[in-house]
UniProtKB/Swiss-Prot annotation:
Gene designation per UniProt: smtA
Species this chain originates from: Chloroflexus aurantiacus (strain ATCC 29366 / DSM 635 / J-10-fl)
Family designation: Belongs to the CoA-transferase III family.
Transmembrane helix among keywords: no
Name of the molecule in the record: Succinyl-CoA--L-malate CoA-transferase alpha subunit
Transmembrane segments: none
Active site: D227
An MF annotation (GO) of this entry: CoA-transferase activity
Tagged with keyword Transferase: yes
Length: 455
C-alpha cells in the first residue's frame, strides 16, 4: 500500500464496513432546518496531489445552473464534468432512497454513500423531491424555470408519465437545454428497452471484439465505459447548445443513446464491413494492423504492453533485443511480412520478455524509444512518479469518512483549471437551502412538504 504521506495529508482512511451496513435511506432532519454542508478540498496549491485551481477564481461555467435528475452514471457524469468547471449542480433525488448509486460499490462508514458515489457524484448539492407526487412536480418545474441545463437518464417515457415532457419543460423555460441519455435513445423500435453499459457494450459491437479468438467474449474491463462515453458526448452537446443559446436565446434537446456513443468510437468497423463485407473479430491483446502489439509477461510475473505499429518501431525493438537482424528486409523488417508471420514474431517477443524482469524490459525498450508501458494495478499507480507529478489524484475530505483519494479533474486548462469542491453529498444536504433561498419557500412550508414526504 502507498505511504499516506504521498497520497493524503493525514493517516485517516475510510472505515471498512460490511455490505449490510449500506442502506437505501438517509436520515432527514425532523424540522425544516438545512442539513450540514458538504466537504471542501483543502490541499495546498504546492501539493502534487491537489486539485488544480483550488482558489476562489471564477471558473468558465460559473453562473450556470444544472439540474441532474438521473441515476447512476450515464448522463450524471456529464453534470460532474460541468460542476468541475464552475457550474452549480443540483442533484434531484427521491427523499427515501436517493440515487441507487449510493448503494453500489465499496461500502464506507456513511450509510448513504459508497466510494463510487463519493467519487462520481462530486461537485453536487443533493435536493430531495418526490417527482411521483404533483406537488413534487410543481417544485421541480420552479427549479427548471431558474436553471440552464437539465440532465435525465430514465427510460424514455418516464419523464412524460410524471408530466415533465419536453414541451412542458420548454414552455416553463424556453432557454432550457435538456440532455437525455438512455440505452437506445429517445426514438427507434428499441427505445423502451432497459439500457445499461453492459448491454450497450454488447449491442454496439464492443463486447464482440473483446477477448481471444474462438473464446467467449469478455467484458471490456470492469468499468461501465458506455456510461462515461455517453456522458462525454452529452457534455460536448451541452457546450455546443450553450453556444447556440448565446447566439439565439433558445435552448434545445440533446438525445444520446449509450450504445451509439460506444459504436462511434469503434474506428473503421463500419466502413470495412460496408465496403468489403469484412467483420472484425476478437484479437485478444493484439491488433490486426500491427505485430508485435500486445501484452507480454516478464520473468518476475509482471506484464508489459508493447506496440510496434511501424517498421521503424520494430527496428528499435530488434535493437533492444540485441537482435537487429530481425528487422532486415529478408526477415520481419516489412510490416506485411511481420503480419504474415504473426505467430513467429509474437513468440520471439514472448521469449525475450520472459527472459527479463519487467524493469529490465522497460529500461531496454525506453532506451531504444520502443513504445512500451507497464500494465499497472491501482497500487502501481498510487506509487508512480508520473501520476504524482501530474496531480492525477485529488485528496478530498468527505463528511463522516475522512480523506478520500479520487481521480482528479480532466482536462487540464492553463487559465481556468477545474476543481473538485466536494465529494458525493449526503442525501438531501441542500434541500432546505435550495427551497428557502432559491425558490423563496418559507420554513413552515418546507416543514409541511417534508412531513408529507414530498421532499
Amino acid at each position: 500500500m502507498a505511504k499516506a504521506s504521498r497520497l493524503t495529508r493525514s493517516t485517516g482512511q475510510p472505515t471498512e464496513v460490511s455490505e449490510g451496513q449500506v442502506t437505501g435511506t438517509s436520515e432527514m432532519p425532523p424540522t425544516g432546518e438545512e442539513p450540514s454542508g458538504h466537504a471542501e478540498s483543502k490541499p495546498p496549491a504546492s501539493d502534487p496531489m491537489s486539485t488544480p485551481g483550488t482558489g476562489q477564481e471564477q471558473l468558465p461555467l460559473s453562473g450556470i445552473r444544472v439540474i441532474d435528475v438521473g441515476n447512476f452514471l450515464a448522463g450524471p457524469y456529464a453534470a460532474s464534468i460541468l460542476g468541475e468547471f464552475g457550474a452549480e449542480v443540483l442533484k434531484i433525488e427521491h427523499p427515501l432512497g436517493g440515487d441507487p448509486m449510493r448503494r453500489f460499490g465499496t461500502a464506507t462508514a456513511r450509510h448513504d454513500a459508497t466510494l463510487a458515489w463519493l467519487s462520481e457524484a462530486r461537485n453536487r448539492k443533493s435536493v430531495t423531491i418526490d417527482l411521483r407526487q404533483q406537488e413534487g412536480v410543481a417544485l421541480f418545474l420552479k427549479l427548471v424555470a431558474k436553471s440552464d441545463i437539465l440532465i435525465e437518464n430514465f427510460r424514455p417515457g418516464t419523464m412524460e408519465e410524471w408530466g415533465l415532457s419536453w414541451p412542458v419543460l420548454q414552455a416553463t423555460n424556453p432557454g432550457l437545454i435538456m440532455l437525455r441519455v438512455s440505452g437506445y435513445g429517445q426514438t427507434g423500435p428499441y427505445r423502451r428497452r432497459s439500457g445499461f453499459a453492459h448491454i450497450a457494450h454488447a449491442f454496439s459491437g464492443l463486447s464482440y471484439l473483446a477477448g481471444f479468438p474462438g473464446e467467449t467474449p469478455v467484458l471490456p474491463g470492469t468499468a461501465p465505459l458506455g456510461d462515461y462515453i455517453a456522458s462525454l458526448f452529452g457534455a460536448i452537446g451541452i457546450l455546443i447548445a450553450l453556444r447556440h443559446k448565446e447566439q439565439t436565446g433558445r435552448g434545445q434537446l440533446i438525445d444520446v443513446g449509450i450504445y451509439e456513443a460506444v459504436f462511434r468510437i469503434l474506428d473503421e468497423i463500419a466502413p470495412a464491413y460496408g465496403l468489403f463485407g469484412k467483420i472484425r473479430e476478437r484479437e485478444g491483446a493484439g491488433s490486426f494492423i500491427a505485430v508485435p502489439h500486445g501484452h507480454f509477461r516478464s520473468k518476475d510475473g509482471k506484464w508489459v504492453a508493447i506496440a510496434c505499429t511501424t517498421d521503424k518501431m520494430f527496428e528499435r525493438l530488434a535493437e533492444a533485443m540485441e537482435r537487429p537482424e530481425l528487422a532486415s528486409p529478408e526477415l520481419y523488417g516489412d510490416q506485411r511480412k511481420r503480419l504474415a508471420a504473426r505467430d513467429i514474431v509474437n513468440q520471439i517477443t514472448i521469449e525475450w520478455v520472459g527472459s527479463l524482469t519487467r524493469d529490465e524490459v522497460m529500461r531496454r525498450c525506453l532506451e531504444k524509444e520502443v513504445p512500451v508501458g507497464p500494465l499497472n494495478s491501482i497500487a502501481d499507480m498510487f506509487n508512480d512518479e508520473h501520476f504524482l507529478a501530474r496531480g492525477n489524484f485529488a485528496c478530498i475530505e468527505a463528511e463522516g469518512i475522512g480523506e478520500v483519494v479520487v481521480p482528479n479533474v480532466i482536462p487540464r486548462l492553463s487559465e481556468t483549471p477545474g476543481r473538485v469542491t466536494n465529494l458525493g453529498p449526503p442525501l438531501g444536504n441542500a434541500t432546505y437551502e435550495v427551497l428557502r433561498e432559491l425558490l423563496d419557500i418559507s420554513a413552515e412550508e418546507i416543514k409541511r412538504l417534508r412531513s408529507r414526504k414530498i421532499i
